[in-house]
C-alpha cells in the first residue's frame, strides 16, 4: 500500500497540528494497518512566507491503494489522468469512503492545493485553515475523491481542488460534505 484516505479525522477539524501533525496521523494510521514501515506524508499544501506544495511532499510513485490497485504511476499521472475515484480512494483499512450520493456525504477531502498540487502562493484568501492549525476560523481547499459535485465541470470532478470549505471546524466541514479526511501517500 502506498496511498489511502484517512479513515478518521484526528479530532479537531482542519487543525491537524500543521503538516507535521498531519504526517504523524498518516504514519499512525498506516502503522495500525500494518504499513508503518514506510514514510507517510499527508497530501496537503501550506501557504505563508515559504509555501509548501503537496505534490513535492509525497515522493514519485507509483502509489497503490490497500487492495493493490494503482491510483497513479507518477506525479504527472496523479495530477493528470489518474485512477483516483470512489472505487479506488480507499482508507488504510481498505474500506470505501462515502461519496456525494451516500449518507453521510464525506467526499470533501482536505488538500489546500490547486489542481496541479501546488499551494495558493501569494493568495490573500486562506485555503489551508491557517496552515492546518485552525479548527475554527478560515477555510480549506478540498477535493472530491468520488469525482462528483453539484455541476459537471472540472472543479466539481477534481480530486484535489474543487472548492473551499465553509470553515475549519468539524461542523463547517460537515456542512459542505466532508469529515476532515485527507489523503496520505508513501513518500518512499
Language-model regions, residue ranges each:
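Secreted/extracellular ectodomain signature
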Residues: 1-188
